[in-house]
Amino acid sequence: MAQTAYLKVTRIAMRSASNLSKRRVEELNSGLGELRQLLSCVVCCQLLVDPYSPKGKRCQHNVCRLCLRGKKHLFPSCTQCEGCSDFKTYEENRMMAAQLLCYKTLCVHLLHSALFGELAGMRPQVARELVPRIKLPPKTTQEFIREGSNISDTFDIFLPQPDLPFLKDMPTSLPAETPPTSAVTTPELPYDHHLNISDIEAEAAATAEQGHFSPLPLLPTGSRMGMLSHAGQIVIATESSESGFMDQAWTDQVDLSGTVSVSKYTNSGNNFAVSYVMPTSATTKFDPQELQIGQVVQMADSTQLAVLAAVEETVETSTQLTVLSTTVEETVETSTQLEVLTSAEEPNEISDQLANLQVEESDEALVEETVEEAEGTSIPSEVVAEHMEEDQHLDVHTSQSPTQTEMEEAVEEHVATKTQLGHVQTELQDAESLQKDFEDAKAAAEEAKEKEKDLHAISAELQKEDSDEPTLKRKRTRTLKASQAAKIEPVPSEVKTKVQSGKGALRRIRGKDKEEKVKPPKPKCRCGISGSSNTLTTCRNSRCPCYKSYNSCAGCHCVCCKNPHKEDYVESDEDDDLEDFEMPKDVPEPMTQSEEPVVAEPRQEENSMAPPDSSAPISLVPLNNLQQSQHPLVLVQNEKGEYQGFNIFQGSKPLDPVTVGFTIRVQLQHTDGFGSLPQYAYIMPTIDPPNPPAPSLSPPPPPAPDREVIEPPAKKFRTSRTRRGRANFSALDTVDELVSGGSRSNSAAGDRSSATDNAHSLFEEIMSGSDDL
C-alpha cells in the first residue's frame, strides 16, 4: 500500500508545475496525506524510526522499535494486530526503512520545486474509509513536506567517510541523482561523458521548470553510499532554501551565449566544470559562440587558471620576501647591537646605542637577552676586567659626546655597570665563604666517621662477650653503647653551628648527620643458607644468632622455622634508650614446658611497670580488632565453636598467657601485608564441667503425694438381664417365643391377645434401660 501511494505521488511530482491542473494538485495533496499515514507509527503517530511490522499480518500497521508495547491509536481498532505487543509478535521491516528514505528524497524534491508554492495553505484531505488508520497531526501539507525532508538518516553512519579534506565540504550526492537545475547553475557529467539535452529540457532549464525530466533517486541526498568507489557528479544548487510561492511560472528567456565553464574544485582528481552566466560587460578570452549549455570544458587548457595560479605564486613569494627582509633586518640589528656591546674600542657608538635602547622597548628587551646569554651562568675574572675597561673608555669619551642627553645616558650606564660589578664581587665573596665552611664541615664529618668506626669495633667485641650470657648482660652492654653514643653526640651539634652561613653545604652536612645517627646493623639470621646437612635444625643451635639472643628469626630462609622464641625483648631502636633510664627491679624467670620450650618474655613497656599484684583477680578483655592488640593474644572458644580474641590482665597490668598456664600456642597467618597482627596467639584450654557430687547417706526425701486423677465415668452398658430374673417375666428362649408373645408353643404372631402387650412391655424395658447409658 505504501509503495502504491508513493508511485502515485511521484508521478505527479515529476511533472512541471505549469502544466498541472488544479485537480492534479489536489491529488498530490491527498496522496501526500495518505503516504504520511502509511509511513507513520500507529503508537506515536510520527514518522517511523526503525520500523517493525506484525508477524504474519497484512494490515501493515507498523510501529517504531521503541513503541512496541505502546497503545495503538487506530480508528477503528485493528483485529489482526490487536494482540501484538512484544518482540515475539513483531519483526523488523527493512523494506519500510528503504521506503522512508524514498519518501525523504521525494520531500526534498518537492521542497525545492515550484509545486511547493502551489501547495501553500492546503491541508491533506484523506478519504474516510473503514480501514483502521491513524489521525494525522493538525499540520499543513508544506509542514509535512518539511518534516519528511528532515528525516534523520542513520543508515550512512557506519559507511567510510572521505579522507581528503576537500571532499568533506562537497555536497553529498549519489551517482544517479540529478539535482535541481536552473538557468544560473547546470550540472555537468564527468569528462568522458557528454550530456545530451533535448529542446524540451533546455527550455525547461531556461524557464526554471526543473527536474520533471530527471530520474528521481531511491536514496536521500544525505546518504554517502558509494562516495569513494564512484566518481559522482558535483551538485551545486543556487540556494538550499525552499522555493517560494509563485503566482505564475517564469517564462522569460535568458541568453546563455555568454556562459563560461570554470572549475569549481581545483583540488579534485576529476575535471568537473560548472556553467555560469557571465555579465555582458565582462571581458573573457572565451568565444561566446563556442560555448553551449552543459558543455564540458577541460580545465587543463584554461589560461585564466594559469594566470590566477601565477598571481597567487607571486603574492606568496612577495610575502615571503617581506618576511625574509624583516627577519634579516632584525638579525642585522641584533648582530650590530651585540658587536656594539662587546667591543670596547668604540664608545661613541655605545652611547648612541644606549640612547636608541631607551627609546625602543623591543630593542631593549633583545639587548637584555643577548647580554644575559653573553654573561652565562658563571662570571669569570676576565669579564670583570672587560667591564672595567669599558668603564674607563666611557669616562674618557663622555666629554666628546656632542649632546647633553648622550652624556647623561652614558653616565647612567656607567653607574649601572658599577653596581653590577659590586654585586658580582659580593657573590664571589659569598661563594668563597661557603667553600670555607664546607671544608670545615667536611673535616668534622670525617672525624665523626672515625669515631663511629671505633664505636663499631667496641660494639662488636661486646656482642661477642655477650653471646653466652643471659639477657641482663645484653642489656648492660646496650647501656654502655648508649653512653658511648651520648659522649659523641656534641660533635655534630658543633658542626651545625659552624656551617649555618652556607646554603648548599648546610644541606649536605644535615644529610651526613642523619647517617651518623644510624646505629650499626644487627647480625642477620643465616638459617637455611648456612650449608648444613639438616637445615631444619639450624634455627635451634648455637649457630643461629637470633636463637642465642632469645629473639625471633629475622629474614629466616628455613623450610620451617624451629626457633621457639617468637617475640623480641626490644622491638625497635627507640626502646634501647628507654632501657637506660628504666631498669626493672624484678625480672620473671622463663617457664619451660615439657612439650616445647616456651620462654615468657614481657615487652619493654611491661618491664618498665611495677610487677602486678598477685592478689588481684585475672580478667580477660575482649578485642574487636585483632590487629589493635598491643599485648599477647589469647583465643577463647565460645559456645558456637568460634574463637574470639582477648587480652589477659591481672588488675590493670597485662600478663603473659604462659604464666597463667596457657601452653597451647598457634601461629597466625597474615592475610593483609600492611596489618600488624601478632605472629602467635595462645589458646585458652577448655574447662571441663564439674563432676556431680557423690550421693549423701542422708535418708531419702518422702515420696511425693499421689495425685488423684478424676476421670469421667466409663460408659456403662446395661447388662443382659434375663426375663427370668424379673418378676412377672419369663425368659424368651427362642425367636418364636418373642414373636408369639412369650408362648412356648409354636404359634404365629397375633394368635393371642396378649402378644401386643408383651411387645409393648419389651419396648418399654428397652427404653427404660437407655436412661442408664
UniProtKB/Swiss-Prot annotation:
Region Clamp-binding domain (CBD), residue ranges: 620-685
Residues reported to bind Zn(2+) 3: C525, C527, C539, C544
Record's compositionally biased regions (Basic and acidic residues): 705-714
Any one biological process term the GO annotation gives: protein localization to chromatin
UniProt-annotated stretches for the region Disordered: 460-525, 572-616, 687-773
Binding site for Zn(2+) 2: C59, H61, C78, C84
Regions annotated as coiled coil: 424-468
Ligand binding (Zn(2+) 5): C539, C553, C558, C561
Highest taxon of source: Eukaryota
Pathway assignment: Protein modification; protein ubiquitination
RING-type Zn finger ranges: 41-85
Role according to the record: Limiting component of the male-specific lethal (MSL) histone acetyltransferase complex, a multiprotein complex essential for elevating transcription of the single X chromosome in the male (X chromosome dosage compensation). The MSL complex specifically associates with the single X chromosome in males and mediates formation of H4K16ac, promoting a two-fold activation of X chromosome. Msl-2 is only produced in males, constituting the limiting component of the MSL complex.
Official protein name in the record: E3 ubiquitin-protein ligase msl-2
